[in-house]
């Protein structure tokens, strides 16, 4: 298997556990991975049931000193990270090195907004869940248990989408111009003479 310098995965529409298992395996193989738009990750099952599960997790704490953990992270990026950490032997040197190859973000911060993003088909909700099954968005769950930055991320994402659309429109116009210029050059008399001479 060839290792890319960095693979950027767009988390939107992926199931948390399935994506985590694929990413964990690649990290252990030496691949650097960045997961963006963690707030758009999905969990199967209705919102209320997943919220109850998270509240059950909130009750788990050290009896005599709560600061000793377990720590209940609310941000979508940290919830995904914790799910993935359980799939890696994170207390060994190999596991620690693997987790250092991972970055998880809400939204798509620079410089990853300019990088090519990929999806993982075996973790996509539309391919894995039966149509009509209920699912929860990680951002919604996080907000319901105390994550405060959903509005901030949404605002930044809206700005990014506008600039991305502008860039794409410019790129498409430029490609069209290049194609028409090439077509014109191919039809010119000089091009025909060169073609006759075998060039």
Curated annotation (Swiss-Prot):
Keyword field contains Acetylation: yes
Any one Gene Ontology BP term: negative regulation of translation
Subunit structure of this chain's protein: Component of the large ribosomal subunit (LSU). Mature yeast ribosomes consist of a small (40S) and a large (60S) subunit. The 40S small subunit contains 1 molecule of ribosomal RNA (18S rRNA) and 33 different proteins (encoded by 57 genes). The large 60S subunit contains 3 rRNA molecules (25S, 5.8S and 5S rRNA) and 46 different proteins (encoded by 81 genes).
PANTHER family named among the record's database cross-references: LARGE RIBOSOMAL SUBUNIT PROTEIN UL13 (PTHR11545:SF3), RIBOSOMAL PROTEIN L13 (PTHR11545)
Classification via PROSITE patterns: RIBOSOMAL_L13
GO CC annotation: cytosol; cytosolic large ribosomal subunit; nucleolus; ribosome
Domain of life, per lineage: Eukaryota
Localization terms from the record: Cytoplasm
Name of this protein: Large ribosomal subunit protein uL13A
Residues that bear N-acetylserine: 2
Alphabetized UniProt keyword annotations: Acetylation, Cytoplasm, Isopeptide bond, Ribonucleoprotein, Ribosomal protein, Ubl conjugation
Family membership: Belongs to the universal ribosomal protein uL13 family.
């Amino acid at each position: 298997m060839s290792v890319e310098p960095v693979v950027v995965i767009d988390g939107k529409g992926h199931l948390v556990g399935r994506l985590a298992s694929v990413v964990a395996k690649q990290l252990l193989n030496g691949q650097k991975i960045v997961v963006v738009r963690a707030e758009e990750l999905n969990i199967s099952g209705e919102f209320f049931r997943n919220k109850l599960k998270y509240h059950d997790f909130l009750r788990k704490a050290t009896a005599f000193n709560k600061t000793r953990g377990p720590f209940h992270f609310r941000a979508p990026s940290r919830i995904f990270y914790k799910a993935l950490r359980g799939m890696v032997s994170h207390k060994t040197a190999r596991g620690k090195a693997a987790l250092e190859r991972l970055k998880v973000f809400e939204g798509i911060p620079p410089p990853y907004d300019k990088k090519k993003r990929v999806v993982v088909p075996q973790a996509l909700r539309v391919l894995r869940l039966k149509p009509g099954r209920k699912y929860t968005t990680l951002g919604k769950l996080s907000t319901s248990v105390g994550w405060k930055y959903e509005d901030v991320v949404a605002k930044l994402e809206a700005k990014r989408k506008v600039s991305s659309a502008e860039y794409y429109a410019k790129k498409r116009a430029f490609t069209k111009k290049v194609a028409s210029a090439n077509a014109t050059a191919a039809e010119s008399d000089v091009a025909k003479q060169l073609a006759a001479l075998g060039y």
